[in-house]
Design a protein with these regions (language model features):
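Sec-dependent N-terminal signal peptides
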Residues: 3-13
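Hydrophobic beta-strand positions in extracellular immunoglobulin-like domains
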Residues: 40-41, 55, 86
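Intrinsically disordered, low-complexity Pro/Gly/Ser/Thr-rich segments with frequent PxxP/GP/PP motifs
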Residues: 62-92
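Short, solvent-exposed loop/turn segments enriched in Ser/Thr/Gly
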Residues: 22, 31-38, 92-96
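Terminal connector regions
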Residues: 88-121
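Hydrophobic residues positioned within well-ordered beta-strands of beta-sheet architectures
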Residues: 37, 51, 80-82, 95-97
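N-terminal edge beta-strand
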Residues: 16-32, 66
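Short acidic, flexible loop segments centered on an aromatic residue
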Residues: 44-62, 100-101
Length: 121
């Protein structure tokens, strides 16, 4: 039984997307009472064209933020940058920024990939 499982794991290739930086930092914005960070998302999946960004607390509950694109189209093997603004009163609550693949086709693998980066304290 275990041999079959190990074999399947070895032959299966898991493609996900990438997000950088690993430990983003908030910086002051030119707008009053807002802080800003930027993350880059790289699409490694040919079955996914859209990605959603989100900011979360330590319990993975969403925190309100502002970005030009919450959901953004990213072609296969391309990058996109998300600029995220947050009210500075939430700075201590925001622990993670995550990107999640958005499935749009029935022929896709059916697997949603979600990658989170942790904010440095």
């Amino acid at each position: 039984m275990y041999r079959s499982l190990i074999f399947l794991l070895l032959i299966g290739v898991a493609n996900a997307h990438q997000m950088s930086p690993t430990y983003p930092k908030w910086s002051d914005s030119y707008l009053d009472n807002l802080i800003v960070t930027r993350v880059r998302v790289f699409n490694q999946r040919n079955d996914v064209e859209y990605y959603e960004i989100g900011v979360f607390d330590k319990d993975m509950k969403p925190i309100p933020f502002v970005s030009q694109y919450d959901i953004r189209g990213i072609k296969y093997h391309n990058y996109a940058e998300f600029t995220v603004y947050l009210n500075d009163k939430y700075k201590d609550d925001a622990k993670y920024i995550c990107s999640k693949s958005m499935l749009t086709e029935l022929k896709s693998t059916g697997v949603v990939s979600r990658i989170c980066s942790k904010f440095k304290d």
